Amino acid sequence: MIENNIKMKNIKNSIIPLVSIIILNYNAGNLLTNCVDSIKKTNYDNYEIIIVDNDSNDSSHLECSKKFPEINLIENKENSGYCEGNNVGIRKAKGDYIIILNPDTLVDPNWIKELILSYEKNGDGLYQPKFLTTTDHRTLMSTGNMIHLFGFGSSRGKGEFDDGKFNEHEIIGYASRTCSFSKSKIFNKLNLFDPFLFAYHDDLDLCWRGALVNIPSHYAPKAIVYHPPEGFSFKWNNFKF
């Protein structure tokens, strides 16, 4: 606890900024409630949770809102896709920082603090944490997305044992939208996600547009987020296509 307090004092101007956590939901079932439950155990107090529901028919968003009435629930009248669904949340967000988070994730209690500390140290950009599997917390899911020689995106380190090889901050090819973190001004500068894509490759597109205007993608390894080996939207595959 003392170490955490010292770290927080290192944040610029000793101001604890508001963080908006945006979770896009579409029939995620109990995964959504479990995700929010893990967020509630975060060692950071100044945040808001915005759940954007893309016209689910499994009542997962209603059950989550019932258990956590303090969340801000936005119910879209139709499935507007991953990109525009998250854009709805970004437009409603009040935070200095924004986190885009998938509903099938669980978070480490220090994740927000470590993301902010990395951002304050390394500057503007699009950030991702270290992803470990929910099954054993020791197998890597991603330590940064990279662009293959032939143009394909891949998740570096996926399936490898976390032996400490990827424990340093790095500039990466692009940040995963499983959990993507930046200041609200950066998302707005990039005109948010491109709704033309609907879903998939949206993270590569956003970060590519960022790189073109000198907004790099960063890997923040001290921030930890857990993700299933086979995610809610993806099957186990090292490649992003």
Where would I find each of the regions flagged by the language model?
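Short aromatic/hydrophobic "clamp" motif used to bind/position activated sugar donors
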Residues: 98
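Glycine-rich, basic loop-to-helix element that forms the pyrophosphate-binding segment
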Residues: 75-93, 103
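A short, conserved alpha-helix in the catalytic core of glycosyltransferases
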Residues: 173-224
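Short, flexible, basic/aromatic active-site loop/helix in glycosyltransferases
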Residues: 148-172, 188
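Conserved donor NDP-sugar-binding/catalytic core segment of glycosyltransferases
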Residues: 105-152
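Short, acidic, metal-binding catalytic loop of nucleotide-sugar glycosyltransferases
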Residues: 37-46
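Active-site-adjacent helix/loop segment of glycosyltransferases
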Residues: 213-241
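Acidic helix N-cap motif at the loop->helix transition within catalytic regions
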Residues: 33, 58-66
